[in-house]
Amino acid sequence: EMMDLAIERTDHIHARVGSPQAAQVPDPRIGKGLGWTKRFEVWWDRIIEARAAEGRPFLTINPEFGPPPYQAINPHTEEPLADIWEICLWMSNRFRTRWADL
């Protein structure tokens, strides 16, 4: 019910994938991160379908993943575990492919 209300009121998707343990997953392309990505995509699909059904001409989406402290780092080297720019491009391309027919 709460998600239904949120979906009804959403007109922008800030497409960062998080989990109960972190504001963003270390890498949304693999492993548990991909699992969370797929879960978020179900919600995002519902938002996009709802706006399309209303006849809205567009919906804004930004695939933004932040640097540390949002981004997971190697505790020994303090280096990021993934390339944020590559993740954002991957997410953007995934959106374009997923929703190309809308």
Report each predicted region and the residues it spans.
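Histidine-acidic metal/acid-base catalytic patches
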Residues: 1-102
